[in-house]
Amino acid sequence: MSMIFNTEYGYLEALTRGFKNGMLKHSDYLNLTQCESLEDVMISIQGTDYGLIFGGEQSAPSVEVIERCLRDRLLQQYYYIRSHSTEPLTTFMEFIRYPFMIDNVALLVAGLNNHRSMKRLLRMCHPLGEFDQLGAIEVASNSAELFDAVLIDTPIARFVPRDLPMESLRYLDVEIVRAHLYRAYLEKFYAYCSQLGGNTANVMTNLLSFEADRRTITIAVNAIGSDIIPKERLKMFPTCGYLPKIALASMSTLNDTDKIRDVCNVFDGYGKMFDNLERDSDGMITLEDRFLMMEAKKNVQTFLQQYHFGIFYSFIKLKQLEVRNIVWISECIAQRQTDRINAFIPIPLD
């Protein structure tokens, strides 16, 4: 198996491991947090493996410029791997893009419902989630046209539930739409990875099960106090996680964080994510942050094994988190809120 894998994918695996080794280390983050201006941030970044990514930039230093250039580098690395891949890795790489597409669609649906400028929103879309039909949003004037333009004849059409009410799409909370799409995405990606077998199946089903549980718990917590009935909540919970169906059914009925934690403790120990949460100073560490920390550890551990596609998935996840961290630090510097500058998500690469 290892010989077959190396013949087809050995170069891309080695390349991706090299990309990962070039990510920011603890000392790099320390240098960034000591910057006094966005100009300093850009100079510091160019002293890392990013190199002269701002070399051709004519705009004044801003968080938007920094984020765009960082995303462009992620885009270059992704498409280099994608363009040199063969099946089944090509399809696997497409699955990595789908969450970005879903987020872009959710952004545009929310914009349409709130009468925002579509041209401006299109510029805010993540480049990894762009697809040809996305431009059709600009001319959509109602939910029916939006549904036809984006949710039918597009790469993410396969994730649209049959019972999603098209006629009330304009009035649905965009997070509900996103949750339905993500559930279908995770379940189909899980099934695809399981079919691949070998180390890829072992690594990816573990990562996707965690992602499914994270989404379930987050949705359950966010639904507390809402008017979403248990039956509708349950429809948004992915079923490919470690949490069994009885846990999902139970959490769909709960309106108390402590009870959700108790259910998590009984089945998989996720309850520790809630420990001392209310005592974190100034809300610096949220439930989402704790899940991101756990996700970062899991994705770093993916590189301890060989001969599997999981490293491509984990690299994109880690790189996405790195961009998020740099943008957070840049925002704190731009807004002179340096007391919060260290509240980024540590990536244990050292």
UniProtKB/Swiss-Prot annotation:
Membership in a protein family: Belongs to the V-ATPase V0D/AC39 subunit family.
Record-linked PANTHER family: VACUOLAR ATP SYNTHASE SUBUNIT AC39
InterPro entries in the cross-refs: ATPase_csu/dsu_sf, ATPase_V0-cplx_csu/dsu, ATPase_V0-cplx_dsu, V-type_ATPase_csu/dsu, V-type_ATPase_csu/dsu_dom_3
Function text: Subunit of the V0 complex of vacuolar(H+)-ATPase (V-ATPase), a multisubunit enzyme composed of a peripheral complex (V1) that hydrolyzes ATP and a membrane integral complex (V0) that translocates protons. V-ATPase is responsible for acidifying and maintaining the pH of intracellular compartments and in some cell types, is targeted to the plasma membrane, where it is responsible for acidifying the extracellular environment. May play a role in coupling of proton transport and ATP hydrolysis.
Subunit structure and binding partners: V-ATPase is a heteromultimeric enzyme made up of two complexes: the ATP-hydrolytic V1 complex and the proton translocation V0 complex. The V1 complex consists of three catalytic AB heterodimers that form a heterohexamer, three peripheral stalks each consisting of EG heterodimers, one central rotor including subunits D and F, and the regulatory subunits C and H. The proton translocation complex V0 consists of the proton transport subunit a, a ring of proteolipid subunits c9c'', rotary subunit d, subunits e and f, and the accessory subunits VhaAC45 and ATP6AP2.
Lineage, highest ranks first: Eukaryota, Metazoa, Ecdysozoa, Arthropoda, Hexapoda
Lyase keyword on record: no
Superkingdom as given in the UniProt entry: Eukaryota
Protein name: Probable V-type proton ATPase subunit d 2
Organism this protein belongs to: Drosophila melanogaster (Fruit fly)
Cross-referenced Pfam families: vATP-synt_AC39 (PF01992)
Disulfide partners: none
